[in-house]
Amino acid sequence: GKPMLWHLINRLRQTSGIDEISVAKSILKENDVIENFCKSEKLFCYRGSEEDVLTRTLESLEAHDADVGVIVYGDNPLVDPVVVDEVIDFYKVNREYDWVGNDLLTTFPAGMEVEVFNIGALLDSSNRETDPSIREHGTLHIRQNPNTYSLWNIEAEGVRRRPDLHLGVDVGEDLEVVRMIMKHFSNGAVFRLEDIIEYLDRNPQLPLRNRNVHRRWRKYRQSL
């Protein structure tokens, strides 16, 4: 099969709101294979600090002269391009916000995280934040300071409101679940979050495989 990153990039290419895709990885030797993959896919790959993700993100965006950044995480190969565009579209219409995303409060399934933000706000957060454990999480300083920055969280509605599901890949159990989903939808048709949820609800044993995994990111987020 194709690498996880290929599936993610393929889904991001179905969005209408993203102008350019940049893969931001660290300078560690183990990421050379990702840089080579990016070259084969004609993608821009920025290599920066391993620990300081805030600086790496900022430099990657500055290399494109971007004024707005969109973050989608590399371990979320099932992210829905429609969800990505919804967050981008909300930001475009509501420019008074420094940051718009769907992960301040977890209402979507994990693995659907999208953040859109003003580069000026990210630069400001970089100038203010000195704690390496905060800088390691990119936009975390912005998300933790609602009195400094104007934030908006987009909540999932209807069938998409499933914070109990985990569609990202943190551990081996997650990879099993994601592979089963991809295998089910391997006929090449574009599949959306609603389709994934319907499939998991018809196969309830599958989401149980990774339901009880300890998630480090939960301490940085509110959950319902």
Where are these regions (language model features)?
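N-terminal glycine-rich phosphate-binding loop and ensuing alpha1 helix
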Residues: 1-25, 30
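Acidic helix N-cap motif at the loop->helix transition within catalytic regions
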Residues: 30-39
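Conserved donor nucleotide-binding strand/loop of the catalytic core
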Residues: 39-51, 62
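Acidic donor-binding/catalytic loop of UDP-sugar-dependent glycosyltransferases
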Residues: 53-59, 74-90
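Conserved nucleotide-sugar donor-binding
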Residues: 66, 114-126, 172-176
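Short aromatic/hydrophobic "clamp" motif used to bind/position activated sugar donors
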Residues: 69-70
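Conserved donor-nucleotide/metal-binding helix-loop-beta segment in metal-dependent transferases, i.e.
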Residues: 80-107
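Conserved alpha/beta core of the MobA/IspD/sugar-nucleotide pyrophosphorylase nucleotidyltransferase superfamily
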Residues: 138-224
